[in-house]
């Protein structure tokens, strides 16, 4: 009997310590507990939409409900619902306000005259408590228009055409608690217009044309809690105590105006203010003492303004602040100790801000911070003690991996291997094709070298993705600022530009020899070598120039994890944006147009010149072959560059482009030419096919030599002319001497000569 209480006490004590140990789990910096489990998960696995804990603890409490804006939004939604016609649908009570105008509804002491085509305030019984006059044609509020409605508690005048409000329009409304004047045309409110509204708690005047206000505008509003002046035309706030006659004001909303600055006297009397919303204005100056007297402020929203400099002590008196939003401002620098006084801060929004001096010290004093929002997910590594950090990805990379998509992680190796192997194979095999046109072969080898660099670039990106696998957020920012990333980005641009210029050079060389066969514009060795060297020099200058002037180009190649500057707008440098446009919409677009025009002209020239000297049937067959080859050359160029041209045009037009596009372009679109050029310019040509046929025939000959020793050896010529179709050439053109100078051949052999440069 005595052992029962003893074991009961042991059970209770054990339970207590078990729960305590589970709830007080100590996790290393950057990790957080899984609820009441002893397991810890890193920051990147919390609030990512996946149940990594197994009990969904890592996905609990991920919503940012700091401040009381969410609760007020719900209340706001309820008010609109209550003020609408739906609130009068279930008429269970009789009307107690006497006769009402046509098209109006009545229930108890509530009157709904929404969309009743009214042009003036209706006259009903004085005991009405709620009057909704929304979406009518009321233009003015005359003196004493509501004087007899002493019991009126809620007045809704939204979506009328009110442009004039008499100073005594609201006289006598001593019981009014909520007044809605939104979506009208009010330009000015005279001082004392709200003088009798001593019980008013909510005043909503959003979406009007108010251009100025003064403290006297709100005289008499001793009970006002909420003041909303969103989307008006205010350009400045009075340099006087705005809350002088609103001592109980808690919520003040100036969103969507044109306010340029905040001075130190404006909020001096707003001692009870808990929420201040100043987003989407044109604020470019903040007085250091602008918020000194807002010691009860819980939420401050300064987002989407034009603030460039934050005074060092601007937030020092906001001891109670739990939510701060300074996102989407062109802030040049954030001081390391900028947030030191905000110990109670729970939510911090820094979206759209490039923080060049970011470091962990900046956020370490924010011990209660649970939500933080950055421009780049790479910044999350500098706030490891914050459970919810957004964004989780930039579309290219994620908190875990340099390449966010498994498809990209696989195909970066596949495309890299195809590009490198194809071009190296051509470089090695090209000397064995004994073509008389060595200058053309030299250009093709140079093209393969440039294309091979693209494969090297993709290989390195894949290697670093493998190196950072599972913990990329720890290395993201250092990686994008590293020499490796800068060099790889330069290598990609070098490959791209040299390849484009070489393709243009090869195309123009063909064009001149086909369209102008009797001109003295034949390619010479010295000229060809000079052009090739010049192209590579231009490529090096274009690719490495951004590394030589960091002030002008900023972090040109370090705007994303793949180090490719497709969206140069992210650098924040006008010079970088112009440079990127010159490359992609200047050099590359002009080159693409030249290639398309040249191949079209060549095909037309061959068609016009050959029809009179060859049989029609053979000519049609030959032109089909030429058309197919020209089509694939132009098609691959278009497939590679048209998407990039479109993206650059859209970015110039400030169209929002998903960040994930960059990685798909870099892995699947940009290398198209690099991967297919070896096939188009070498592997599908007649000389290469003949060489392979010869090697295969010789191999079979060696296999059968023991059985057929007396058989005459097959001895095909080693002089291969790069052309198509070979069998259609006359015997005279099969002699090596006939090809010593392709530009001197007759007009009849133009199509064959064209093939000799393929």
UniProtKB/Swiss-Prot annotation:
CDD domains: 7tmA_RXFP1_LGR7, LDLa. It is a multi-pass membrane protein. SUPFAM superfamilies: Family A G protein-coupled receptor-like, L domain-like, LDL receptor-like module. It comes from the Eukaryota. It is found in: Cell membrane. One of its GO terms (molecular function) is metal ion binding. Residues 1-409, 465-486, 549-577, 651 are extracellular. LRR repeats lie at residues 127-148, 151-172, 175-196, 199-220, 223-244, 248-269, 272-293, 296-317, 320-341, 344-365. The chain crosses the membrane at residues 410-430, 444-464, 487-507, 528-548, 578-598, 630-650, 652-672. Residues 26-63 form the LDL-receptor class A domain. Glycans are attached at residues 36, 127, 264, 272, 325, 368. Keywords: Calcium, Cell membrane, Disulfide bond, G-protein coupled receptor, Glycoprotein, Leucine-rich repeat, Membrane, Metal-binding, Receptor, Repeat, Transducer, Transmembrane, Transmembrane helix. One of its GO terms (cellular component) is plasma membrane. Residues 431-443, 508-527, 599-629, 673-758 are cytoplasmic. Ca(2+) binds at residues 45, 48, 50, 52, 58-59. GO terms for biological process: adenylate cyclase-modulating G protein-coupled receptor signaling pathway; extracellular matrix organization; lung connective tissue development; myofibroblast differentiation; nipple morphogenesis; parturition. Disulfide bonds join 27-40, 34-53, 47-62, 485-563. InterPro entries: GPCR_Rhodpsn (IPR000276), GPCR_Rhodpsn_7TM (IPR017452), LDL_receptor-like_sf (IPR036055), LDLR_class-A_CS (IPR023415), LDrepeatLR_classA_rpt (IPR002172), Leu-rich_rpt (IPR001611), Leu-rich_rpt_typical-subtyp (IPR003591), LRR_dom_sf (IPR032675). Belongs to the G-protein coupled receptor 1 family. Interacts with C1QTNF8. Receptor for relaxins. The activity of this receptor is mediated by G proteins leading to stimulation of adenylate cyclase and an increase of cAMP. Binding of the ligand may also activate a tyrosine kinase pathway that inhibits the activity of a phosphodiesterase that degrades cAMP. This is Relaxin receptor 1.
């Amino acid at each position: 009997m005595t052992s029962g209480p003893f074991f009961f006490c042991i059970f209770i004590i054990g339970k207590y310590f078990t729960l305590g140990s589970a709830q007080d789990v100590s996790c290393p910096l950057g990790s957080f507990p899984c609820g009441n489990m002893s397991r810890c998960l890193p920051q990147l696995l919390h609030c990512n939409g996946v149940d990594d804990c197994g009990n969904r603890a890592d996905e609990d409490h991920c919503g940012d409900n700091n401040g009381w804006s969410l609760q007020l939004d719900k209340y706001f939604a309820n008010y609109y619902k209550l003020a609408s016609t739906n609130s009068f649908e279930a008429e269970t009570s009789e009307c107690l306000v006497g006769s009402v105008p046509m098209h109006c509804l009545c229930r108890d002491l509530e009157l709904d005259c929404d969309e009743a085509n009214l042009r003036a305030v209706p006259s009903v019984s004085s005991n009405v408590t709620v009057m909704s006059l929304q979406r009518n044609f009321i233009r003015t509020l005359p003196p004493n228009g509501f004087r007899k409605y002493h019991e009126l508690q809620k007045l809704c005048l939204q979506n009328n055409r009110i442009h004039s409000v008499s100073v005594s329009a609201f006289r006598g409304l001593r019981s009014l608690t909520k007044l809605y004047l939104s979506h009208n045309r009010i330009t000015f409110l005279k001082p004392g217009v709200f003088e009798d509204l001593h019980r008013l708690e909510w005043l909503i005047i959003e979406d009007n044309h108010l251009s100025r206000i003064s403290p006297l505008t709100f005289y008499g509003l001793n009970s006002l809690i909420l003041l909303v002046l969103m989307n008006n035309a205010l350009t400045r706030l009075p340099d006087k105590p705005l809350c002088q006659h609103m001592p109980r004001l808690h919520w003040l909303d100036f969103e969507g105006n044109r306010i340029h600055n905040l001075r130190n006297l404006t909020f001096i009397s707003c001692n009870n203010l808990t929420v201040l919303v100043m987003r989407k204005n044109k604020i470019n100056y903040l007085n250091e003492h602008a918020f000194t007297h807002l010691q009860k402020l819980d939420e401050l929203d300064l987002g989407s303004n034009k603030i460039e400099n934050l005074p060092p002590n601007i937030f020092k008196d906001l001891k109670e602040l739990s939510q701060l939003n300074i996102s989407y401002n062109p802030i040049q620098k954030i001081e390391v100790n900028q947030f030191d006084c905000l110990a109670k801060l729970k939510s911090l929004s820094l979206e759209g801000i490039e923080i060049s001096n970011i470091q962990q010290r900046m956020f370490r004093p924010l011990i209660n911070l649970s939500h933080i929002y950055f421009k780049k997910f790479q910044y999350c590594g500098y706030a490891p003690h914050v459970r919810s950090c957004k964004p989780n990805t930039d579309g290219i990379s994620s908190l875990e991996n340099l390449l966010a998509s498994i498809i990209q992680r696989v195909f970066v190796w596949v495309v890299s291997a195809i590009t490198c192997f194809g071009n190296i194979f051509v470089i090695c095999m090209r000397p064995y094709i004994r073509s008389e046109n060595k200058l053309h072969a030299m250009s093709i080898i140079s093209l393969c070298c440039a294309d091979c660099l693209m494969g090297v670039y993709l290989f390195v990106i894949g290697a670093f993705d493998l190196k950072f696998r599972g913990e990329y957020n720890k290395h993201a920012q250092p990686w994008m600022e590293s020499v490796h990333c800068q060099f790889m980005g330069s290598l990609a641009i070098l490959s791209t530009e040299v390849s484009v210029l070489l393709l243009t050079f090869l195309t123009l060389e063909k064009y001149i020899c086909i369209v102008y066969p009797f001109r003295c514009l034949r390619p010479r060795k010295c000229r060809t070598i000079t052009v090739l060297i010049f192209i590579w020099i231009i490529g090096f200058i274009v690719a490495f120039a951004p590394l030589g002037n960091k002030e002008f180009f900023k972090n040109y190649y370090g705007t994303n994890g793949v180090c490719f500057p497709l969206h140069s707008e992210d650098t924040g440098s006008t010079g970088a944006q112009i440079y990127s446009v010159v490359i992609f919409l200047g050099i590359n677009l002009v080159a693409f147009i030249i290639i398309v025009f040249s191949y079209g002209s060549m095909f037309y020239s061959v068609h016009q010149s050959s029809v009179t000297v060859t049989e029609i049937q053979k000519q049609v067959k030959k032109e089909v072959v030429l058309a197919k080859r020209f089509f694939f050359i132009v098609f691959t160029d278009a497939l590679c560059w048209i998407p990039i041209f479109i993206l650059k045009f859209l970015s110039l037009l400030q169209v929002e482009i998903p960040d994930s596009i960059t990685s798909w372009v870099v892995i699947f679109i940009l290398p198209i030419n690099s991967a297919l050029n070896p096939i188009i310019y070498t592997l599908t040509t007649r000389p290469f096919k003949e060489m392979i046929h010869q090697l295969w025939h010789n191999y079979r000959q060696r296999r059968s030599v023991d059985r057929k020793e007396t058989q005459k050896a097959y001895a095909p010529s080693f002089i291969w002319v790069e052309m198509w179709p070979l069998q259609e050439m006359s015997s005279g053109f099969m002699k090596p001497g006939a090809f010593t100078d392709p530009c001197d051949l007759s007009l009849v052999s133009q199509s064959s000569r064209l093939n000799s440069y393929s």
